Amino acid sequence: MAPKAEKKPAEKKPAEEKKAVAEKAPAEKKPKAGKKLPKEGGAAAGDKKKKRVKKSVETYKIYIFKVLKQVHPDIGISSKAMGIMNSFINDIFEKLAQEASRLARYNKKPTITSREIQTAVRLVLPGELAKHAVSEGTKAVTKFTSS
């Protein structure tokens, strides 16, 4: 069915162009830019539309790998272990965000600041880990504000 539809306009073009070229030219330009190009491809254009564009998924894999190489340069990590580490970091960040949000609501403030994040870290992470995280976070914020 599609090839017949394409042949008929092709046959009509020479006859119509002889009659009114000025009327046909503006009508052809608009569909070519927007509608005619996908239709001319036929099945090929349909296949291209069916292909899904991959969503860019943000992961922490490259950062986990960089930290691993800083700590143990000679050790590798399997893809399954990397996936587990990525899930772990996502879970921790989720908990920190929820706790920081709760703290902001308790204090009736619309904004989560570094103070809420710091308190959330102290509440979510245990003991010595919280102390190290707070000191590293403070160092990072200081470096960011100074530059």
From Swiss-Prot:
The nucleosome is a histone octamer containing two molecules each of H2A, H2B, H3 and H4 assembled in one H3-H4 heterotetramer and two H2A-H2B heterodimers. The octamer wraps approximately 147 bp of DNA. It is found in: Nucleus; Chromosome. The gene is HIS2B. Its main location: nucleus. Keywords: Acetylation, Chromosome, DNA-binding, Isopeptide bond, Nucleosome core, Nucleus, Ubl conjugation. Can be acetylated to form H2BK6ac, H2BK33ac and H2BK34ac. Monoubiquitinated to form H2BK143ub1; may give a specific tag for epigenetic transcriptional activation. Coiled coil: none annotated. Residues 1-31 have a biased composition (Basic and acidic residues). GO terms for cellular component: nucleosome; nucleus. This is Histone H2B. Belongs to the histone H2B family. It comes from Gossypium hirsutum. GO terms for molecular function: DNA binding; protein heterodimerization activity; structural constituent of chromatin. Core component of nucleosome. Nucleosomes wrap and compact DNA into chromatin, limiting DNA accessibility to the cellular machineries which require DNA as a template. Histones thereby play a central role in transcription regulation, DNA repair, DNA replication and chromosomal stability. DNA accessibility is regulated via a complex set of post-translational modifications of histones, also called histone code, and nucleosome remodeling. Residues 1-55 are annotated as: Disordered. There is a cross-link at residue 143 (Glycyl lysine isopeptide (Lys-Gly) (interchain with G-Cter in ubiquitin)). Pfam families: Histone. InterPro entries: Histone-fold, Histone_H2A/H2B/H3, Histone_H2B, HISTONE_H2B_site. The modification N6-acetyllysine is found at residues 7, 35-36.
